[in-house]
């Protein structure tokens, strides 16, 4: 295999899946410095063609960025070497998954598109979609061998299928972290929030077939007029509109509702932000999710703040919106 991971080498995905794992497995690994769309939007596909890359590992945000530049760009390159296109870092929304299958796998390749879920703390994937499994839109996959994952309530009771709750891991697994360096009590906290389990801090749903949907961080859940709404749900609704390439939402304090929603939307090429489009997007969210999830305001910035690995930094958007300290920006994409 010729393996291309688009992460920054300083992140756990980078040093684990650019350096350690490929070399341990005897795989040729390709890595480059800079954003995945620099110096031009087609650079990723140019590299796949030039080096006959067989496996690509990237973030869903990168897929949505590729979508922004249209379906025709990847078709200009020979991508027949691709056999696996996999994502991690945040939920892979159905539109992005379908685009990858339609545009990448419909471009002369037989590539399998897969999602997976893990954290820095777990050291490697815990949920995933193997090539022998059917990929399901917006689902990270099933618990991988050696991992006992469950969706539970605050007391640790297992939730029924298709009911949201906290994602926990019940037993130690081969690649888990064993402590927080210099702060063992902090490590113990994650094993004490839910009895007899490691609490990941993510909210998830498990269906009747054992497929997990990771909705987002527990602290990314908005509380609008007493309704708990996942940021990923609102972002997914926005991205499902044909004019939208990427979206990020935050909660703002509201004296009446507790919080209201502000959305930041990156439009696809050929679309321009306007009050008319804002109204159309609000109507679209109302149709998809209901009136309670409609953003109070939609902004159309030129770009969203991201880490070098492609994750949107929502805390920065919120800090800027509320006039707070933006904190550590050392991982910010240049």
Residue ranges and their predicted role:
Residues 1-5, 9-54, 68-69:
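Conserved AMP-binding/adenylation subdomain of ANL enzymes
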Residues 1-3, 20, 24-27, 54-58, ...:
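Gly/Ser/Thr-rich phosphate-binding loop
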Residues 49, 56, 173-174, 178-179, ...:
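AMP-binding/adenylate-forming catalytic core of the ANL superfamily
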Residues 69, 184, 194, 241-242:
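Acidic-histidine catalytic/liganding microenvironments
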Residues 81, 146, 243-246, 291, ...:
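Glycine-centered tight turns that cap/initiate beta-strands
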Residues 89, 118, 141, 202, ...:
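Active-site glycine-centered loops adjacent to acidic/histidine catalytic or metal-binding residues
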Residues 142-146, 157-190, 229, 325, ...:
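Conserved ATP/PPi-binding loop(s) of AMP-dependent carboxylate-activating enzymes
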């Amino acid at each position: 295999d010729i393996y291309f991971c688009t992460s920054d080498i300083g992140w756990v995905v980078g040093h684990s899946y650019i350096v350690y794992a490929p070399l341990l497995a005897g795989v040729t690994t390709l890595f480059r410095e800079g954003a995945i769309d620099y110096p031009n939007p087609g650079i990723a596909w140019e590299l796949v063609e030039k080096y006959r890359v067989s496996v690509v590992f990237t973030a869903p945000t990168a897929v949505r960025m590729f979508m922004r530049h249209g379906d025709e760009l990847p078709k200009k390159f020979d991508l027949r070497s691709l056999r696996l296109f996999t994502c991690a870092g945040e939920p892979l929304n159905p539109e992005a998954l379908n685009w990858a299958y339609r545009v990448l796998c419909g471009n002369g390749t037989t590539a399998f598109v897969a999602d997976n879920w893990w954290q820095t703390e777990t050291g490697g994937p815990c949920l995933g979609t193997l090539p022998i499994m059917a990929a399901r839109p917006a689902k990270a996959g099933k618990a991988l061998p050696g991992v006992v994952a469950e969706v539970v309530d605050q007391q640790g009771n297992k939730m029924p299928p298709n009911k949201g709750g906290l994602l926990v891991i019940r037993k130690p697994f081969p690649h888990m972290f064993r402590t927080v360096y210099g702060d063992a009590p902090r490590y113990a906290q994650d094993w004490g929030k839910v009895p007899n389990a490691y609490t990941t801090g993510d909210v998830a749903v498990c269906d009747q077939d054992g497929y997990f949907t990771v909705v987002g961080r527990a602290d990314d859940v908005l509380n609008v007029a007493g309704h708990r709404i996942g940021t990923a749900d609102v972002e997914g609704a926005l991205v499902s509109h044909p004019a939208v390439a990427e979206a990020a939402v935050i909660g703002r304090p509201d004296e009446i509702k507790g919080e209201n929603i502000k959305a930041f939307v990156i439009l696809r090429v050929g679309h321009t932000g306007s009050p008319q489009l804002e109204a159309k997007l609000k109507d679209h969210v109302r149709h998809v999710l209901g009136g309670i999830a409609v953003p109070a305001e939609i902004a159309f910035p030129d770009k969203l703040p991201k880490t070098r690995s492609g994750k949107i930094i929502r805390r920065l958007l919120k800090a800027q919106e509320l006039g707070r300290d933006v904190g550590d920006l050392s991982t910010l994409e240049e």
